[in-house]
Regions:
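Glycine/small-residue-rich interface belts in oligomeric ring/scaffold proteins
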Residues: 17-86
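Residues in well-ordered beta-strands of folded domains
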Residues: 7, 62-64, 113
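N-terminal, Lys/Arg- and Ser/Thr-rich interaction peptides
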Residues: 1-20
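Generic preference for well-ordered secondary structure
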Residues: 13, 19-23, 47, 92, ...
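Internal, well-folded beta-alpha domain core
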Residues: 66-237
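Extracellular structured ligand-interaction cores
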Residues: 3, 58-60, 107-111
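A broad, structure-centric signal for solvent-exposed, well-ordered loop/edge residues
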Residues: 13-15, 36, 112
Length: 237
């Protein structure tokens, strides 16, 4: 199977966790639902179209962390727009601005693996990424957090039934057969992320995943992984 590989990075990223309220927290990496939006922005799919174009039954996505995850908190200034207009000064009990603390990933750097059943869409995506072109501006979660990307290649991947290997990407917990081999210095974390949603932005599937926050590979016995011609092993979400 042909897989497009490219790197994406920026100064800051914010992928809002679905279970946070007034003080937004971020996932450590972009979940598949966010990556689909990035892919749609690259080739020009609008917000109503990209969910279908990159649906889970047509598109496979894998995420690799390339640099250590560092999180910081910054204040976001929200303006008061009640009544459908902005008051630049305090009015009654309503301040002109409200500062909300939010969590961000600092200097995020990821590698994205993408495969698509539709050869035309796959080739178009590869052409845009290789020539460093986009139809819409690409960002990392929020429109203000601009992203840059770089083409890494198109590789052949073969599916493997089972084995003890070093996985480069984020791994679903359900793929582990006998746990993992802990290495000194590695930092392992688990998160529950959305992996699929419908046109109404209703999440159809969540997945508990394992990742190593320093960007190191995870040695584990897993089933259903994919091995590339360069020897890299990944798991599609």
């Amino acid at each position: 199977m042909k897989v497009l590989v490219f790197d994406i990075w920026g100064d800051l990223a914010h992928f809002k966790r679905f279970y946070t309220t007034s003080s937004p927290l971020t996932f450590s990496f972009p979940p598949p639902t966010t990556i689909k939006g990035i892919l749609g922005a690259i080739i020009g799919c609008d917000k109503e179209e990209y969910i279908d174009v990159f649906s889970r039954d047509r598109c496979k996505i894998s995420i690799q962390i390339l640099k250590p995850i560092k999180k910081i908190r910054l204040g976001l200034n929200y303006i008061n727009t009640k009544g459908n207009f902005w008051r630049p000064t305090k009015h009654g009990k309503h301040e002109a601005r409200t500062q909300i603390p939010a969590e961000f990933v600092k200097n995020p750097y990821y590698r994205i693996y993408v495969s698509h059943k539709d050869g035309k869409i796959f080739d178009r995506l590869g052409e845009y990424v290789k020539s460093h072109r986009t139809f819409y501006t690409v960002s990392l979660g929020l429109s203000e957090l601009l992203a840059d990307f770089r083409y890494a290649g198109v590789l052949e991947f073969m599916e493997r039934v089972e084995g003890e290997v070093e996985i480069s990407s984020v791994i679903p917990i359900s793929a582990l057969t006998e746990g993992l081999v802990f290495k000194e210095g590695n930092r392992y974390f688990k998160e529950r992320i959305p992996v699929d949603m419908n046109q109404d932005r209703i999440v159809l599937k969540y997945e508990d995943v394992l990742y190593e926050s320093q960007g190191n590979k995870i040695l584990a016995k897993v089933r259903g992984f994919w091995e590339g011609e360069d020897g890299s092993c990944i798991y599609f979400l």
